[in-house]
Amino acid sequence: MHPDNIHKDSYDFEALTESNPQLSEFVFQNKYGTQTINFANPEAVLQLNKALLKFHYQVENWSIPKQYLCPPIPGRADYIHYLNDLLSEENIQGEIRGIDIGVGANAIYPILASRIYDWKMLGTDIEEKSVAIAQANIETNPTIAKNIEIRHQEDRGSIFKGMIKKGEYYHFSICNPPFHASQEEANKATSRKFKNLGLEKGSALNFGGQANELWCNGGEALFIKRMIKESVLFKSQVGYFTSLVSKKENLPKIYKHLNKLKADFKTIEMGQGNKKSRIIAWKFD
């Protein structure tokens, strides 16, 4: 985990439950004598996120409905910190502006970017309901509302088109693309998680997420390919284009597309516990 990430150490559940008393009913002591929660329980994770956002980032009344993706905040914060490292190399003067592709109902990247570094953020999403929920989460917090704008992407075939307006400039784009290539693939992945946890199918688990959050035709690799192709059209309006890459085996294809377009790119490795992922960042001269 990034050295600047305040979540790199274990959770202080005493402070977190004081911040959000509803979390206390989900906290227990594991066999090692450490306080924890059941991370497979979506309500427990939701209450943990509420506590983390309130205690560390002074964000109140954040919430998302059931079946929406409930993000792990430490990992999302890591992406923001590594982005800051990337931008620090650019010697940027003045305020920093970024665009989040697929902001979701949780709007977690803009929220963290605003609270950690005071960046100005634009969040976009193809789901109108997600946009409304994200907007509600932001409007209840004046400290972040001044920094964040949410736009609905009405054209499902476009990523940047229609979202980046004439005359606008963003120092970076950020994206956590849909992971799976189909609903069937997403269902199989969920079944494997049930099996690994030794739970019956149908249990309440934190494997939520709307279809557009979990999968798209072609999965992560094709989505990033589309993003790379469209990014050329906005090379003068975005400094660094970036995306999370969860599947390492997708990197060779991504590199091929970037080389074809003569992009300058780099891969930033990230790790949270046993989970390994990376950011692909590219720009055009």
From Swiss-Prot:
The keyword Acetylation is assigned to this record: no
Function: Specifically methylates the adenine in position 1618 of 23S rRNA.
InterPro entries for this protein: METTL16/RlmF (IPR010286), rRNA_lsu_MeTfrase_F (IPR016909), SAM-dependent_MTases_sf (IPR029063)
Swiss-Prot/TrEMBL GO biological process terms: rRNA base methylation
Lineage per the UniProt record: Bacteria, Pseudomonadati, Bacteroidota, Flavobacteriia, Flavobacteriales
Entry GO CC: cytoplasm
EC numbers on record: 2.1.1.181
Catalytic reactions of this protein: adenosine(1618) in 23S rRNA + S-adenosyl-L-methionine = N(6)-methyladenosine(1618) in 23S rRNA + S-adenosyl-L-homocysteine + H(+)
UniProt xrefs under SUPFAM superfamilies: S-adenosyl-L-methionine-dependent methyltransferases (SSF53335)
GO molecular function: 23S rRNA (adenine(1618)-N(6))-methyltransferase activity
Subcellular location as annotated: Cytoplasm
Highest rank taxon of the organism: Bacteria
Keyword DNA-binding: no
Ranges in a coiled coil: none
Family: Belongs to the methyltransferase superfamily. METTL16/RlmF family.
Keywords: Cytoplasm, Methyltransferase, rRNA processing, S-adenosyl-L-methionine, Transferase
Source organism of this protein record: Christiangramia forsetii (strain DSM 17595 / CGMCC 1.15422 / KT0803) (Gramella forsetii)
Protein name: Ribosomal RNA large subunit methyltransferase F
